[in-house]
Amino acid sequence: MLCLPVFIILLLLASTAASNPLETRIQSDLIRAALEDADMKTERGFLGVLMKGLKYLGKVVPIGSLVKDLLSSSDE
């Protein structure tokens, strides 16, 4: 007779936990997608800043002469 209430309680606990894995899977997918978006935004932002810096550097010092100087110094 004592087994019946325990069985009912376990059945209730199991039924409430059944919907949880789907929710956590969806939540983890959403979190992963958000992190990938944030990572891509960071890369685009970093590359944009890097390209702007190189463009500015190209205006100050011509990139061709800078590369030529670097290549000639590595030959020595």
From Swiss-Prot:
NADP among keywords: no
InterPro entries with a match to the protein in the record: T-conotoxin
Entry keyword annotation includes Zinc: no
Pfam family, one: Chi-conotoxin
Tissue expression remark: Expressed by the venom duct.
Signal peptide interval: 1-19
Single GO term (MF): toxin activity
Highest taxon in the source lineage: Eukaryota
One cellular component term from this protein's GO annotations in UniProt: extracellular region
UniProt-annotated location(s): Secreted
Keywords: Neurotoxin, Secreted, Signal, Toxin
Propeptide stretches in the record: 20-52
Note: The mature peptide does not contain cysteine residue.
Family statement drawn from the similarity comment of this UniProt entry: Belongs to the conotoxin T superfamily.
Name of this chain's protein: Conotoxin ArMLCL-022
Species annotation: Conus arenatus (Sand-dusted cone)
Organism taxonomic ancestry: Eukaryota, Metazoa, Spiralia, Lophotrochozoa, Mollusca
